[in-house]
Amino acid sequence: VFNEFFETPENSPARKRPGIYDVRYFEEGGKRLQVLLLDTRYFRGPIVLLPKRGRNGPYDRNLDPEVTVLGGAQWKWLEEELQKPADIRIIATSIQFLPVDHNWELWQNFPHERQRMLDLLRETKTGPVIFVSGDRHMGELMELPAGDKQSPGSPVYEMTTSGLTNAGGGQKGEPNRYRVSPTNFQSRNFGLLQIDWATQLVTMQLCDIDGKVVDEYKADLSQ
């Protein structure tokens, strides 16, 4: 149903395998943009509940090293794709990747899988990447700096946006050590990425439902 609705080409490998992960390429003026679309639901193991729900969410960390987010085949595919040439890479994930301070759905529900992603970015020498995510019913902009002990060697950026019809998730100003703006944006919003190919700067923008920019941050992908 997903492939039919989004008109996935009939000859696409995405139609012949479990899950809905895929990749798209866009080229302009000799520059190449790679957009990796991950499936973080189909293969994901169980989420563990906290004994008592806290202010920042109901989920605990699943420390079972055998539990996966992407599944073996998708991890292998991702490693192969990250080694293909691209000037800028964007990774789309339905759940937040960088945050580690809340207990809603996020990659940190499975710390070993989040670390596996960072290790893969380091091993493939991918360079700076931008994650785009949703699920949280709010918006925020983030950066894992190159100098951070968890960094894969280059900065990792993330833009989370709400749905177009629903917002108000989480807590205003909930903890997030990687957020680069004073707080999160609780009203309905959408995101824009403005790419300057000459400087390798990507301006991440959060916009309200009227199109007004309410937050922005420049991601330096030349590092």
Protein language model features and the residues they cover:
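Long, structured stretches of catalytic cores involved in phosphate-ester chemistry, encompassing
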Residues: 1-223
